[in-house]
Amino acid sequence: MQKKPTSAYVHIPFCTQICYYCDFSKVFIKNQPVDSYLEHLLEEFRFYDIQKLRTLYIGGGTPTALSAPQLEVLLKGLTKNLDLSVLEELTIEANPGDLDADKIAVLKNSAVNRVSLGVQTFDDKMLKKIGRSHLEKDIYENIDRLKLAGFDNISIDLIYALPDQTMDQVKENVAKAIGLDIPHMSLYSLILENHTVFMNRMRRGKLPLPKEELEAEMFEYIIAELEKAGFEHYEISNFSKIGFESRHNLMYWDNAEYYGIGAGASGYVNGVRYKNHGPIRHYLSAVEEGNARITEEYLSQKEQMEEEMFLGLRKKSGVSMARFEEKFGRSFDELYGEIVRDLVQKGLMQIEGDRVRMTKRGLFLGDTVAERFILE
């Protein structure tokens, strides 16, 4: 009997605007079959007969692009058969400017206990430049409303190294973020993805991005300021006050299995990584036929070990060598000892007791270091 995952990701692909940097599975909400989508999504959720989850994460797209009644249908449908005494964290992503009093009332009356706001930047001109429709004032209004409704576990996403962004603008953003008095932040450098407005502009030479040295300086400044303000840098892009780490995201970095529900969602169940149909009408038909998945990949032990390292090294706490050996029945030193010693010598990794982890410099070079753990 295989152990069932205790986490699920639920994808709501609708947006009220399409941001210039985003390549996630999403569509503009107008004229979309939203109610039918929610029915099919809940049908897919029921198919897995999920009764116990530790973490549930509703992302997008923009879940709060749904109307208050639609949000209620979604939240009630997802939690109806769940044992809520086991559910530690139910996060919903929200857009500043989308969260009116009715939607907050729905969240308050549901099992949601964590809200993640896509702030991106506090600069109104920059918000317009990156295709966001909210304003700085909406951020403060939404956070005040959420706090008034009793939500204390609030997170924001910020992006740095944006087009034409200066160090002073980053400093101002960080100061404003700290001033919100919330316990969690995710900070990402702008990554150019294919099929986005920004990638098309860059290819035409029309996207003035900060140089790599300035981006590194921004990253170092962000870490130093947030640590000074009492945040722990617990994962490459994530900072939290003690006890407010994102349990759902820690589950990903611990390389645990999870259900992926909804159009374009990815999941990892019984050693199989899968992806669902992305286009909404394809997804609806696939659910009706009894299988929402479009791709499935069985991971070999080699691939599982590589993923254990790639994901685990994103965390400040790194990877436990004993847990690795217990999970895979292989000697960590035989597989990775030489590589780790080389990276320690280069100042990119350190060994602390049973754990191997990245240094600050290693964290900045993240993927370059992780690539060393691909097994030949």
Where are the predicted features?
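Short amphipathic alpha-helical interaction segments
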Residues: 329-344
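Minor-groove-contacting beta-hairpin "wing" of winged helix-turn-helix DNA-binding domains
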Residues: 355-359
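Short, amphipathic alpha-helical interaction segments positioned at domain boundaries
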Residues: 361-376
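A short, conserved structural fragment
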Residues: 344-354
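Conserved N-terminal Rossmann-fold NAD(P)-binding element of oxidoreductases
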Residues: 10
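Local cysteine-cluster metal-coordination motifs and their immediate loop/turn environment
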Residues: 13-26
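C-terminal scaffold of the Radical SAM
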Residues: 3-5, 26-48, 52-330
